[in-house]
Amino acid sequence: MSRDTIVAQATPIGRGGVGILRVSGPLAQQVAEQVLGKTLTPRMANYLPFKDSDGSVLDQGIALYFKAPNSFTGENVLELQGHGGQIVMDLLLKRILQIDGIRLARPGEFSEQAFLNDKLDLAQAEAIADLIEASSEQAARSALKSLQGEFSNKINELVDSVIYLRTYVEAAIDFPDEEIDFLADGKIETHLREIIAKLAKVKNEAKQGAILREGMKVVIAGRPNAGKSSLLNTLAGREAAIVTDIAGTTRDVLREHIHIDGMPLHIIDTAGLRDATDEVEKIGIRRAWDEIEQADRILLILDSTENQVELDLVRSEFMAKLPPHIPLTIVRNKADLSGEAEVLNEQNGLTVISLSAKTQKGVDLLRQHLKQSMGYQVCTEGGFLARRRHLEALEQADIHLQAGLIQLTEFYAGELVAEELRIVQHHLSEITGQFTSDDLLGNIFSSFCIGK
């Protein structure tokens, strides 16, 4: 790995009460000697002036030095905590970069150093970014659990079980003349089924973590004046969209970020769908369809006071244009005017909810439906956060475990069982970074903040 000494601002760019510069690498102590005029004792706070190359004082603050390997990155680390003015931070950063052998850190490079120095695994490194970006208390708590190793521990337990079983299978292959037929005695099958059950549990928890991290994109669609913007306002709990009796009031895409019991929802209100002649409205309708095609779920809003034949036509025309893979929920709005009961039922394979966005009756039915449609389960203790790549790795591991079970129970093919288990181990180890390509590492860490 690179032994460069890197520096970056660890606090957000802009003005604040405190600004922190972080230096990591072999030359961290040399930076302290040149900028502070003093050799620092590890893990001791020092209040000192920060000096320019000509000896003039740039700022004064607290300096902390951590000697490798006892630091976040596993390298020598120096932190300078000064006043948070951006000019001051820039001057101090410029001063440090004048020292030979020091360069500006790439995004996520401090966390990458920590990963490469075995201070944390890849799932924990990703949890740092997730904790910073958490949009709810539950997401933050779950990210912290991942950072503390809860997710990694579950993966490592699975890997250990797979390694144990691989050893057992390969022993059966290497010693075929033993009196006991290890492949047929039932022990390998029992262990394999136990691993499959454990993996299923971790997959379910990871799915919850992915929902908590990434949320669900819900697009509200329908004809003008059906009550789309009113529903957006009701779900958001504020007047996010202008609501009038004039058809076509909403002409552009409106976005709101909300939470339902900790589950993040990206709610998108769109222009009313109709044959428009106004050029601006046409653009809004094109954008509406762009959002519809990228949605996790569509809420088609119908005005329940209109003629049922007309509503059936609206629904059939919309469904004819809708990409087949996108889930659809029918919302019959204005139940307070039509006299419909606020209920949820199934019709022809579609969920239909009658509600009133104006009075908010029946809206809780919609909230519960959105949670259930994503498979989200409220966990008061908090789980761990997971990413799509984690889910994909777990899914691949499950596929190869099932394949291994078939090879064992139907064909007694020990070599093929061992190969499937090797592939399972590889996919699981990708999650923690034990087996990970350099390209994947680059993609992951490049999405981090500069000073992380």
Swiss-Prot record:
Annotated CDD domains: trmE, TrmE_N
InterPro entries assigned to the protein according to its UniProt record, in alphabetical order: G_TrmE, GTP-bd, GTP-bd_TrmE_N, GTPase_MnmE, MnmE_dom2, MnmE_helical, P-loop_NTPase, Small_GTP-bd
Residue numbers binding GTP: 225-230, 244-250, 269-272, 333-336
Positions bound to Mg(2+): S229, T250
Subcellular localization, as worded in the UniProt entry: Cytoplasm
Domain TrmE-type G intervals: 215-375
A GO cellular component entry from the record: cytosol
A Gene Ontology biological process term: tRNA wobble uridine modification
Keywords, comma-separated and alphabetical: Cytoplasm, GTP-binding, Hydrolase, Magnesium, Metal-binding, Nucleotide-binding, Potassium, tRNA processing
Annotated PROSITE patterns: G_TRME (PS51709)
Residues that hold (6S)-5-formyl-5,6,7,8-tetrahydrofolate according to the record: R22, E79, K119, K452
Cofactors that this protein relies on: K(+)
Enzyme class: hydrolase
Highest taxon of the lineage: Bacteria
Keyword ATP-binding: no
Cofactor note: Binds 1 potassium ion per subunit.
Binding site for K(+): N225, T244, I246, T249
EC number: 3.6.-.-
Listed GO MF terms: GTP binding; GTPase activity; metal ion binding
Transmembrane spans: none
Subunit text: Homodimer. Heterotetramer of two MnmE and two MnmG subunits.
Family: Belongs to the TRAFAC class TrmE-Era-EngA-EngB-Septin-like GTPase superfamily. TrmE GTPase family.
Role summary: Exhibits a very high intrinsic GTPase hydrolysis rate. Involved in the addition of a carboxymethylaminomethyl (cmnm) group at the wobble position (U34) of certain tRNAs, forming tRNA-cmnm(5)s(2)U34.
This protein's name: tRNA modification GTPase MnmE
Organism: Histophilus somni (strain 2336)
